[in-house]
A protein has these predicted regions:
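C-terminal and inter-domain tail/linker signature
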Residues: 1-132
Length: 132
């Protein structure tokens, strides 16, 4: 699912949407801004629009992808600038992706650290290191 992040980071939103299952659920309820759930490809488009309303140049840097069966834990950072404040942000972020039929069916964003995201998929730090 590296291709989803690559598409989003280079601004190719339609490619990212193509990689999503028609029934995708994007859970952004852990986020400070726009904390809600988005459903379907139209929901994904709305999330992208909502993100643009708050951030300039928002992108993610992925440091690690951890395989958890049909799920993937992505550890990295969110980088961008607040539209209203002009404050540059670079904060740790973890995301959990669920794959079905080779497509992204669930995108859970807003985990603030690695441990929290690993627990969401039933893994411990030890489990994650064993797979490395």
């Amino acid at each position: 699912m590296r291709s989803v992040f690559a598409a989003l980071n280079c601004g190719d939103r339609e490619r990212a949407i193509e990689l999503a299952h028609p029934e995708i659920v994007l859970d952004a309820t852990r986020n400070v801004f726009n904390p809600k759930t988005y459903v379907g490809k139209d929901g994904l488009r709305q999330w992208l629009t909502d993100t643009d309303d708050v951030w300039e140049g928002m992108h993610t840097e992925q440091d690690e992808f951890i395989d958890a069966g049909d799920r993937v834990v992505v550890i990295g950072r969110l980088v961008g600038k607040g539209k209203g404040s002009g404050v540059e942000v670079g904060q740790p972020n973890a995301t959990v992706l669920t794959i079905r039929d080779g497509l992204l069916i669930r995108y859970e964003t807003g985990y603030t650290n690695r441990r929290e995201a690993l627990e969401a998929v039933g893994l411990s730090e030890q489990d994650a290191h064993a797979d490395s």
